[in-house]
């Protein structure tokens, strides 16, 4: 249960260097043996019937206790045939004007009817019909707010959405249906919402865990929800005392999402929060190679490998699928030094819920 919280959130927009929003709130698994009978001098043998009960008792089902915060989680409360209608409260561009693409932070009302958790997703059904005259299909988006929302009253849900616009092979400009629908919303506009869904990216229960977050672009969404709960909120039943380490990869510095928020968290929690950016078009490593997220991680390779050997280290990866191979390449050589097959070890981490991936 969340107690009173207070946090200043800076969301840069194209019209001003930052939008400062003051947020304060009050919260929200028989064997019958052979028998002889003596009668005078004649012995009468009575052969006993031997029966054996071969029915086996059903095996006891062992329920594996999850290391994640799954208690009371709700999934698929709202389905495509009966979605929840949310209303847009806020829609702010959070990338600079010179960024390669627009990303928007969108806040919807839920009136407490969509009980999501950090790490879950919701679906959005855009208005209109497709070329076949049928309603558009839903698109899933990772939730970018903590369970009590940006306003701390458990009545909103936030998304981080990049506007999809590209030129196809025929030279035509193509716009993503749902992303453009969302990025064009004005306060007061409605949107059909489904879900919540997902358990893969739920936070670990252990408040002393090491949580390594690897995100590219809008893959930052679930990690913003994690970090708000850890560092911007106060809860009676949860206080994070571990280490949160965020690696965020983007093409340009004007594409860094929620930068001011994260820097404020780091300033106030220097012992519990580490923050590393990888800006591929502006930064290089000592070899002159572009600074992708795996390039930045390579600078801390030995330290990361030591953390991955611990039972209370959890890795979460969200964003572009391409970063997976680069991260594997780093870990293969490190694990080999200890005589460990990295790909097999990663499977063990997945089974123990310590390696969690949501890429696209």
Swiss-Prot record:
<feature type="domain" description="FAD-binding FR-type">
    <location>
        <begin position="81"/>
        <end position="203"/>
    </location>
</feature>
<dbReference type="GO" id="GO:0009941">
    <property type="term" value="C:chloroplast envelope"/>
</dbReference>
<dbReference type="GO" id="GO:0009579">
    <property type="term" value="C:thylakoid"/>
</dbReference>
<feature type="modified residue" description="Phosphothreonine">
    <location>
        <position position="210"/>
    </location>
</feature>
<dbReference type="GO" id="GO:0004324">
    <property type="term" value="F:ferredoxin-NADP+ reductase activity"/>
</dbReference>
<feature type="binding site">
    <location>
        <begin position="139"/>
        <end position="142"/>
    </location>
    <ligand>
        <name>FAD</name>
    </ligand>
</feature>
<keyword id="KW-0285">Flavoprotein</keyword>
<dbReference type="GO" id="GO:0009536">
    <property type="term" value="C:plastid"/>
</dbReference>
<comment type="function">
    <text>Plays a key role in regulating the relative amounts of cyclic and non-cyclic electron flow to meet the demands of the plant for ATP and reducing power. Probable electron donor required for the MgProto monomethylester (MgProtoME) cyclase complex reaction to form protochlorophyllide, thus connecting chlorophyll synthesis with photosynthetic activity.</text>
</comment>
<feature type="binding site">
    <location>
        <position position="358"/>
    </location>
    <ligand>
        <name>NADP(+)</name>
    </ligand>
</feature>
<keyword id="KW-0934">Plastid</keyword>
<feature type="binding site">
    <location>
        <position position="290"/>
    </location>
    <ligand>
        <name>NADP(+)</name>
    </ligand>
</feature>
<feature type="binding site">
    <location>
        <begin position="250"/>
        <end position="251"/>
    </location>
    <ligand>
        <name>NADP(+)</name>
    </ligand>
</feature>
<feature type="binding site">
    <location>
        <position position="218"/>
    </location>
    <ligand>
        <name>NADP(+)</name>
    </ligand>
</feature>
<keyword id="KW-0521">NADP</keyword>
<feature type="modified residue" description="Phosphoserine">
    <location>
        <position position="179"/>
    </location>
</feature>
<feature type="binding site">
    <location>
        <begin position="280"/>
        <end position="281"/>
    </location>
    <ligand>
        <name>NADP(+)</name>
    </ligand>
</feature>
<dbReference type="GO" id="GO:0045157">
    <property type="term" value="F:electron transporter, transferring electrons within the noncyclic electron transport pathway of photosynthesis activity"/>
</dbReference>
<dbReference type="GO" id="GO:0045156">
    <property type="term" value="F:electron transporter, transferring electrons within the cyclic electron transport pathway of photosynthesis activity"/>
</dbReference>
<keyword id="KW-0602">Photosynthesis</keyword>
<dbReference type="GO" id="GO:0009534">
    <property type="term" value="C:chloroplast thylakoid"/>
</dbReference>
<keyword id="KW-0793">Thylakoid</keyword>
<dbReference type="InterPro" id="IPR015701">
    <property type="entry name" value="FNR"/>
</dbReference>
<dbReference type="GO" id="GO:0009535">
    <property type="term" value="C:chloroplast thylakoid membrane"/>
</dbReference>
<feature type="binding site">
    <location>
        <begin position="177"/>
        <end position="179"/>
    </location>
    <ligand>
        <name>FAD</name>
    </ligand>
</feature>
<keyword id="KW-0150">Chloroplast</keyword>
<dbReference type="InterPro" id="IPR035442">
    <property type="entry name" value="FNR_plant_Cyanobacteria"/>
</dbReference>
<feature type="binding site">
    <location>
        <position position="162"/>
    </location>
    <ligand>
        <name>NADP(+)</name>
    </ligand>
</feature>
<dbReference type="InterPro" id="IPR039261">
    <property type="entry name" value="FNR_nucleotide-bd"/>
</dbReference>
<feature type="binding site">
    <location>
        <position position="218"/>
    </location>
    <ligand>
        <name>FAD</name>
    </ligand>
</feature>
<dbReference type="GO" id="GO:0031977">
    <property type="term" value="C:thylakoid lumen"/>
</dbReference>
<dbReference type="GO" id="GO:1901463">
    <property type="term" value="P:regulation of tetrapyrrole biosynthetic process"/>
</dbReference>
<feature type="binding site">
    <location>
        <position position="142"/>
    </location>
    <ligand>
        <name>NADP(+)</name>
    </ligand>
</feature>
<keyword id="KW-0560">Oxidoreductase</keyword>
<dbReference type="InterPro" id="IPR001709">
    <property type="entry name" value="Flavoprot_Pyr_Nucl_cyt_Rdtase"/>
</dbReference>
<dbReference type="GO" id="GO:0009570">
    <property type="term" value="C:chloroplast stroma"/>
</dbReference>
<keyword id="KW-1015">Disulfide bond</keyword>
<dbReference type="GO" id="GO:0048046">
    <property type="term" value="C:apoplast"/>
</dbReference>
<feature type="binding site">
    <location>
        <position position="166"/>
    </location>
    <ligand>
        <name>FAD</name>
    </ligand>
</feature>
<dbReference type="GO" id="GO:0008266">
    <property type="term" value="F:poly(U) RNA binding"/>
</dbReference>
<keyword id="KW-0249">Electron transport</keyword>
<keyword id="KW-0274">FAD</keyword>
């Amino acid at each position: 249960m969340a107690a009173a919280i207070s946090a200043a959130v800076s969301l840069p927009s194209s019209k001003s260097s930052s939008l400062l929003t003051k947020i304060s709130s009050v919260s929200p698994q028989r064997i019958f043996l052979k028998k002889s009978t003596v009668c005078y001098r004649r012995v009468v043998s009575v052969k006993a019937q031997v029966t054996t009960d071969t029915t086996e008792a059903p095996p006891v089902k062992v329920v594996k206790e999850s290391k994640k915060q799954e208690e009371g989680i709700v999934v698929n409360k709202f389905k495509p045939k009966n979605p929840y209608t949310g209303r847009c409260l806020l829609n702010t561009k959070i990338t600079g004007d010179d960024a390669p693409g627009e990303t928007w932070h969108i806040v919807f009302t839920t009136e407490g009817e969509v009980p999501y958790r950090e790490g879950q997703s919701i679906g959005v059904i855009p208005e209109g019909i497709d070329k076949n005259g049928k309603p558009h299909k839903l698109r899933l988006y990772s939730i970018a707010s903590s369970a009590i929302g940006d306003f701390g009253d458990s009545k909103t849900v936030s998304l981080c959405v990049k506007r999809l616009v590209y030129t196809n092979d025929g030279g035509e400009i193509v716009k993503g249906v749902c992303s453009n629908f969302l990025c064009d919303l004005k306060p007061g506009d409605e949107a059909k919402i489904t879900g919540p869904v997902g358990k893969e990216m739920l936070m670990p229960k252990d408040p002393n865990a090491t949580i390594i977050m690897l995100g590219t672009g809008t893959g930052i969404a679930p990690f913003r929800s994690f970090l708000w709960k850890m560092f911007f909120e106060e809860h009676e039943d949860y206080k994070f005392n571990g280490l949160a380490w965020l690696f965020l990869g983007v093409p340009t510095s004007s594409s860094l999402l929620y930068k001011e928020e994260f820097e404020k968290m780091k300033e106030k929690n220097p012992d519990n929060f580490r923050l590393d950016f990888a800006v591929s078009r502006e930064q290089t490593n000592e070899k002159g190679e572009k600074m992708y997220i795996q390039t930045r991680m390579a600078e801390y390779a030995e330290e990361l490998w030591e953390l991955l050997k611990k039972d209370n280290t959890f890795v979460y990866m969200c964003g572009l699928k391409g970063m997976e191979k680069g991260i594997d390449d780093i870990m293969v050589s490190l694990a080999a030094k200890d005589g460990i097959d990295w790909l097999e070890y990663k499977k063990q981490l997945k089974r123990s819920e310590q390696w969690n991936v949501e890429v696209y």
